[in-house]
Amino acid sequence: MKTSMQRKLDQLSTRLAELNDLLSRENVTADLDQYRKLTREHAELGPVVEQYALWRQSRSDETAAQELLADPSMRDFAEEEIRSARERMARLEVELQKMLLPKDPNDDRNIFVEIRAGTGGDESALFAGDLLRMYLRFAERQRWQVEMMSESPSDLGGYKEVIVRIAGQGAYSRLKFESGGHRVQRVPATETQGRIHTSACTVAVMPEADEIGEVEINLADLRIDTFRASGAGGQHINKTDSAVRVTHLPTGIVVECQDDRSQHKNKDRALKVLAARIKDKQYHEQHAKEAATRKSLIGSGDRSERIRTYNFPQGRMTDHRINLTLYRLEAIMDGDLDELIGALVSEHQAELLASLGDAD
């Protein structure tokens, strides 16, 4: 293990001991905000220090076995102990490297998932509905909360555009790699010749701003229009101007919300989505040069990049960024995304480790 890494782990071990002392004091809950910060830090450091303790124990085991090598009767046993200890140390070191990787500050945030139908007309809108269901089923499995923010239904079902808010522990860290182009290949219900059609949707996963104040929005930069909400397929149509359209003039970002009958609630939702979109735009601009330098395949989140193909006749899903193909499309469309997300996270961690290695 590198000396710099060991030094860092020693510092974390010392800090955890300090936290244990602070959290054991009688007046620790007097300041609840401070208490929450301490418990959060303790929860983050605990697993790292625990792994480091196992690594140090393995190193002690190796040292003890080295001392037995001089005894001919113990030589075979000692060599086996040394080999076993070194294997454990190597495995633990890789885990510790991953644990020490710089964390994305947005990882624990709630998210907005925006799905837009692209090429393929009605079939694309239907697939947008299928993608929405996939993410909602995944959120349900995680016991996350979901709130519809804005929807523009298609006449034949599905959505031209839909935005949902998903709130739950680690929502962004789990779904941030979903941003990009999603392509579907299947025989549409309206196809009489049995031909396979290809259509596409784009997905954007945006971290929610803690408060609207986190993103500076000058009211003078906003144009807010109200209009009557419209529904597809004979749905209820409001008689009042409850729908809200907010335009951010400097960036040209437009958000419409009409799902609630309250104009005030629609405006509040629109401003939340607007803040997330502005934050997302700033984040991508900030990381564009860095991503170009690293040529990161996983974390770029480029909306124009085709990241995945869903082939229904073959029952397969292929993620083009990591060349992963899974022949369990039905389960994936039902929200079983753990294997896919795990593979993407592992590849992203490998990229980060490689970039840190280059920096060294």
Swiss-Prot record:
GO annotations of cellular component type: cytoplasm
Domain of life according to the entry: Bacteria
Keyword list, A-Z: Cytoplasm, Methylation, Protein biosynthesis
Signal peptide feature range: none
Coiled-coil parts of chain: none
Principal cellular location given in the protein's record: cytoplasm
A Pfam family per the record: RF-1
Residues carrying N5-methylglutamine: Q235
GO molecular function annotation: translation release factor activity, codon specific
Cellular compartments annotated: Cytoplasm
PTM comment, free text: Methylated by PrmC. Methylation increases the termination efficiency of RF1.
PANTHER family for this protein: LD18447P
Protein task: Peptide chain release factor 1 directs the termination of translation in response to the peptide chain termination codons UAG and UAA.
Family per similarity comment: Belongs to the prokaryotic/mitochondrial release factor family.
Record-given protein name: Peptide chain release factor 1
Originating organism: Burkholderia multivorans (strain ATCC 17616 / 249)
